Amino acid sequence: MADLKTNLLGFTMNSPIIGASGTVGYGVEYEELADFAKIGGISGKGLTLHGQYGNKGERLWETPSGLINSIGLQNPGVQHFIDVELGEMLELKQKYGTVAIANLGGHSEEEYVEGAAMLSDSAVDIVELNISCPNVKVGGMAYGVKAEAAGEVVRMVRDACKKPLMVKLSPQAENIPEMCKAVEAAGADAISLTNTFQACAIDLEKRRPVFNNTFAGLSGPAIRPIALRMVW
């Protein structure tokens, strides 16, 4: 069998495959379903400083070539993650060598910074910054849309976090190459592409959008060629 070991930010991984945030929980939920010895790392379910219940109404909708989700960043909060779920991820790392990655979102610069500082003092290996979250100070526009806003929040988090910092970009960014340069200049050690693509589903019987928020995130085979274009 081919040796697929690779290095990510100083960590040797079994393979280049990382369980994407939001798809594998915190890893332990899928331990009996997947061969973790072939997985390089786990990016845990997206966190916010304080726990969130997530969105009401329909949350998942299958498409012919993917899945649309409207979970709403349901999570236990950073401190609960450090106290409970991180330990489970580190147990998986001890068993299989999977790198433990914490995915962090926020609704203000202050939330990002405080959450990052807490994770910086924890045993997590890498912090993945989710900048697709809405900035409540500018009418809800995601941090990941404009390079200037993205660079600013990454710069603030970089100052507060000594862990290797990966920034997960939104495909809704105005200009992906400019965004990459902005977050790199602000201190990002790596870039993750991409988050889900904004999508919509219609309930034909009710003649209205499936999701309470109208739009939700599309993932799956349908977005792979588009994501690869962005990487290229």
Model-derived regions: residue spans:
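Alpha/beta enzyme core
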Residues: K95, H107-W232
